[in-house]
Structure formats: structure tokens, C-alpha cells
């Protein structure tokens, strides 16, 4: 709710009441020497919120600087680092059921939708620490425990999904973070979002979009899924991490 002011204004009283209820429950358990039974990550984030106080939480702030979009996101600063805080030596790491993943029972309440896409089971979760509007997490074949390593089959599915969804949902996009490029969870997933404005990387000033200025990072645009996969595969062979943005068009 802190990411969307109109939503927060409608829910703030109920959110504060719920905040007080959980704070009281935690305090009572701790006073009587009883363990807190919620997920450790959730407990740690909530204790940080208690230290900050509900009334001191701030809405996400934006500032445009030339073609760049700057964001101060207080809530996201509380996000557990998980794998994003670890040194990365290899692009692919085996799935570890002992670490955080999207099949944890306490995440069931965060699943917005379960169903099938292109004959594959898919789960859509909301992101508790959003940095884009309508920020979701799309997890294909969640029970197969795929690590966060893209393969040709999933890439083709993601490409098709983007094109199909784009016909009905203006501004939709999907993003993939590899290990060493922002991925914090070793369970195959995409970031899903819906924006009213284009991402800064799409600005026509950049050379990869036909402009005259060089983007600060290496950036390529592909209009064919097979050509894109050939390049992605070459990055895999070179053990080079990367980010992807799937956009309709």
C-alpha cells in the first residue's frame, strides 16, 4: 500500500489497527518467553517496522532526472537480501529446498492466482516489496523447483506470454534477473509489472533504440525469440550474468 498513495489512504486506518494487533501479539509472546512462530523473514521485517513506528512510514517517492527515474522506496529497504547479498561465482546453482523458495507454506496467502498457461502450471504472487506498479512474481511449474536459470522452453513461453498479454493489458511487462544481476531467490520466476510510462531503458535517445547516446550498460534489443535465445545461450556458456525485460511489440 505504501507504493500506491490512493490505496494507502483507503486502507491506512485498517492497516494501523492490524499493525497494533500483531505488535501486541508479538509482545505478549515475548514477555512469556514464547517463540514467534511466523516466518523468520516476516518477523524481522515486522520488528523493523515496530522500531520505525507505523506513523513514520513514508510513501514511495519519485524524481525524474533527464530520462532517468529515481525512486526512494522506504519499504523495499527492509527487504531481506537473501541470495542478492551473497557473492556469485556461477550463473547456475542447484535448487536448495532449505533456502527461501515460492513453495513455502507461509507464502500461500500471497498467491493471487494459480492456473495453467500454455499447458504449464503457474503461480502469480504479489510482491511485498514492490518497485514497479502492480508488481507481481510469476512462477512457472513451481512444484518442479526449477533454479533461477532460464532455458529455451521457458524463454519461449515468456516471450509468447508477453505478446499475448500485451494485447489486453496496456503497459504490461516482465523482467528476469540472473544470479549476480539482482536475483535474490533461486526458484525460477519473473517480475511482472504494469506501467503507464515506458521504462527509462526504452528512451529513444539510446543507441540500442536507434538514438545517438550510449547506454551506461551493454544493452541489446531483440525482436525474434530464437535470435534472443542464441545470445542468451552465449551468455550462459560464458558464465556471464544478465537482466532481461520482456515487452510487447
Predicted features and spans:
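A short, contiguous, amphipathic alpha-helix enriched in charged residues
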Residues: 154-166
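Histidine-centered catalytic micro-motifs
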Residues: 181-197
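Active-site nucleotide-donor binding segment shared across nucleotidyl transfer reactions
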Residues: 171-185
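Active-site microenvironments that recognize anionic phosphate/pyrophosphate groups
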Residues: 1-154, 172, 195-223, 228-249
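Generic detector of intrinsically disordered, low-complexity, polar/charged segments
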Residues: 30, 165-168
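Short connector loops at helix/strand junctions that flank enzyme active sites
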Residues: 119, 169, 185-187
